[in-house]
Amino acid sequence: CGSSKNLRFLVGFGAKPQRNFEDKKMENLPIVHVVNGRQKKLLQGHPWVYGNEIERVEGEIEDGGLVTVVDFRGRYMGTGFYNSKSLITVRLLTHRQEEITDELIASRVKAACDYRRFVMNRPGTDSCRLIYGEADRLPGVIADRFGGVIVLQVLALGMERFTQTIADALLACEKPDCLLLQNDDAIRRKEGMECFTRVLYGTLPEENIIHENGVKLAVDVLGGQKTGYFLDQKDNHLFVRQFCKDARVLDCFSYIGAFALNAAAAGAKEVTAVDISEAAVQLIEKNAALNGADITAVCANCFDFLRAQVKAGEKYDVVVLDPPAFTKAHANMASACRGYKEIALSAMRLLPAGGVLATHSCSYHMPEEVFVNTVLSAAQDLHRQVRVITLRRQDIDHPVLAGYPESHYL
């Protein structure tokens, strides 16, 4: 970080905000008082206030409306949107006393796009996450670029009013061929919002082919998971690729085959990709054809497939485990650990000495230390000595906001 330009992006707006603790509330806004002891996380930059953290409310509040948040002494903590229907009752837009305007929102969209333009200038890659919600100070907003198509999601009630502002700013900054508003996520229902999908600009192509690390990928932005594809693993796909030359590779929970395709691009001698979804397997086969790759795509439950491969005495040089989140709540962590350990046990049984296991968890509720210890306990049960080559995270277009640990999940 030798230059000021680099330093700006490294610390960004994660730097500790300046605060004025005088008894000033934004004029005419209702006031939310948080209970004593809960102000610490807000002082550290956390952007959420849960319902059980609210002591009392002053003034009439409408869901989706702006509120001022103060601590138990009445000191200013931030300004955000209120939603009584959401577990996250207040989503803070700022920890400073500044007016929330269309211009402010547009400037944050531009800053988010500028950051990605700076860090994602990678040959052979034309897709990335442009807006990552709270980490870009745009709570509940997701925008992913898939080649010429941008997919936008607005998942927080208070941000709904800024949809057109966000869309216009994305069009101005990125100049895509198509902008799709994909507001059909279940999170919107939990927020009390309507679910729908609409093209805001341009024409959605019948087939959308993106490029990642020089690999071609057909992405289904309408029927696929989330916005169509998981962009957080781009750098990890490339990292795993280096172990795959002349290797026999098994990619479990493959979705559309990204790890498998990177293995094939590395010169793997045999690649098998497994997913439980028939639609995903069809995309794996399509993507293999697009890249001229020889990949065996299997539609199966990965737990069952792994057990069957162990029983059959199969061996692989590289096994990739990239399952969906096994837990979305801390209360389910024990069950999640059992799931991660089971697939790790099977994978290790398939690996010879010197084999490589790339295993992942994509849940904030699974702490890194717990996940690593779960995998290592599988090795201990098998009396296998393992080396941890690296601990990796989501790609750099999914930045982690200081004070907001939920933004680190992979």
PLM features: residue spans?
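Non-catalytic accessory regions of SAM-dependent methyltransferases
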Residues: 23-145
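Non-catalytic substrate-recognition/targeting regions of SAM-dependent transferases
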Residues: 131-144, 160-230, 238
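Conserved class I S-adenosyl-L-methionine
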Residues: 246-253
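Conserved SAM-binding loop of SAM-dependent methyltransferases across substrates and taxa
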Residues: 256-268
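Conserved SAM-binding motif I beta-strand of class I
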Residues: 270-275
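S-adenosyl-L-methionine
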Residues: 282-315
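Mobile active-site "lid"/loop adjacent to the S-adenosyl-L-methionine
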Residues: 316-346
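C-terminal catalytic and target-recognition region of SAM-dependent MTase-like enzymes
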Residues: 356-410
